[in-house]
Amino acid sequence: MINGGENMLRFIEYPKCSTCRKAKAELERLGLEFEAVDIVNETPSKEEILTWIENSDLSLKSFFNTSGFKYRELGLKDKLSGLSIEEAADLLAADGMLIKRPILEKDGKILQIGYRTEYATLDL
C-alpha cells in the first residue's frame, strides 16, 4: 500500500470491517499498488460521490450500506426510491458509514463496490 497520484487504485475502506480487511489482503497478495482511504476519517465529498454515480451503471442503492445501523436508523429502505441523486449524495457525504464498502476506484470510476467478486478476476 502506498500513497500515489493519478492512475493509482484507491481502496476506500472501514478498517474495522472484516470484509474490507479480506479485500485489502487480496490487493496486497496480488502485488497491486493502491492508496488506502479510511471512509470515516476521509469521507468522500458530495462531488466525488456524484462523479462515481454519474460514471457508473450501478443503481443508487448499490452505493448504500444497506445492512448498516445508520441506514436502518434513517429508514432509508422506504425512502431511497424517492431520493434524487443530489439528495443521495448529500446523505452519503454526510456519513461515511452509509457508504457501501470497500470501494475500489480508479480515476473517478468505481471498479467495484463491496467484495463479492475477488479482485483477481477484475483484470486490474
PLM regions and their residue ranges:
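Thiol/selenol-based redox catalytic cores and closely related redox-interacting motifs
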Residues: 41-124
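Local sequence-structure signature of Cys/Sec-based thiol-disulfide redox active-site neighborhoods
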Residues: 5-30, 34-39
